[in-house]
Amino acid sequence: MSTQSVIAVKQFSGPDKIAQAYTVPQPSAHVLSNANYDYDLCGSTNSTSLSCAIQSSNIKTESISSSSLPKILPFSTDSNGESSLSRMSQAEFSDPILSSSSTFCTSLYTSSPMNSGSCRKTGYLPFLPQPPKCEQQQNSAGQSSSSLMLLDADLRNSGHADDEHTDDLKDFLNLSSDCSFHGKCSAMAYNEQMEFQFLSEQLGIAISNNEESPRLDDIYDRPPQLMSLPVSSCSDQEDLQDARSPAKVQLSSSRSSSGTASCNKPRLRWTPELHERFVDAVNKLEGPEKATPKGVLKLMKVEGLTIYHIKSHLQKYRLAKYLPETKEDKKQEEKKTKSVANGNDHAKKKSAQMAEALRMQMEVQKQLHEQLEVQRQLQLRIEEHARYLQKILEEQQKARESISSMTSTTEGESPEFAPMEKTEDKAETSSAPLSKCRITDTDAECHSKVDNKKTKPQADLEMVHDE
């Protein structure tokens, strides 16, 4: 009787499941005792008895993955209509579960036969925690809900190995195969209650009416009957997988946060007409800087328009009105200024060229006018010289005529006055060369003057040409 028997649990096909071996020493005959345990499955009166003999047993699980954790105890011991699954998770696995691949090592043992005796008196398994009281049911359910929801992904990954695993555990614990529970309805109720409990802990809102804070069922417009449904555990893994889905928790949490944060503002479409009325109201209130949402709302007088709509639209209007210029606009303006500057420079160059051409033309005209003046003066001088020469020629001709007349008169006189005439002729002849010399001198002077006058205009003309 002292030999030990090894009970080997069937190795599972899942990738993250590891085979477990349980070594239970066979107890001696004088220590064996029987303990009857009643399992009430969701209010049903069917009960099964389980005999267990434990002296000083060491039950060691070498490695239990998180996917096989919720499957080890798919049953519930219920003396007051409470969930054993939540109690088990609360007592043994109260530490937070970080990942689905985490490994738990538990060592449960009883050190003396007195523990088995106390277990017989109380009627509970030695390795299961004591059931909480009625007033602690709400807290235990809330604490277990977090661990249950964190293990939902592991329940989904179990796949088809659930049936084999549960059958092996039932065979190991000598459980009857007809352990059934209510079904989907009770599972849905349990899941909803767990979600509400989790949200109440996160948001700090009480479920009951004992405090002044609003109830969750008032926020979500839920009937209060769902809050008072009894907590029931299910052994049907498919129902639990369908009922416990992380998507529901996410949806409810997002819905609660959005419901508490927002003020249920209806959305409004700003049509062009409505915007025109808004702009008119803002202009009446002396611009967007001095306008207030309340004043704009009073001036617009539109049904369904709230102060939140006016506030947001006024802020957008201010931002749009005082936005800085974009880079494209700046580039276009720079291009325009450059083109204008280039045009101005071109016009300035053209005007400078025209001014220079006009100045050159004025200088040429001035030079031509000066040349004309010089030519006119030369022409006047030439005319004066011609007049002077003509006068000299006329005087010379008169002198010759007078001399010829005098010679003709002398030839017609008498011979009496021949000697006298001879003497006179001598005197005349003596005076004649003198007069001739004088005449020749005067002619030379006249010719020299004329030559000088003729050379002066030629010199002036040469000077003009040189200029």
From Swiss-Prot:
It comes from the Eukaryota. It holds the Pfam family Myb_DNA-binding. Expressed in the root cap and in the exodermis of the root, in the root tip of lateral roots, in the mesophyll cells of the leaf, in pollen, vascular cylinder of the anther and the veins of the lemma, palea and pistils, and in the xylem and phloem regions of large vascular bundles, small vascular bundles and diffuse vascular bundles in node I. One of its GO terms (cellular component) is nucleus. It is found in: Nucleus. The keyword Nucleus applies. Residues 327-337, 419-428, 438-467 have a biased composition (Basic and acidic residues). The keyword DNA repair does not apply. Residues 293-318 bind DNA. This is Protein PHOSPHATE STARVATION RESPONSE 3. It comes from Oryza sativa subsp. japonica (Rice). The lineage of its organism: Eukaryota, Viridiplantae, Streptophyta, Embryophyta, Tracheophyta.
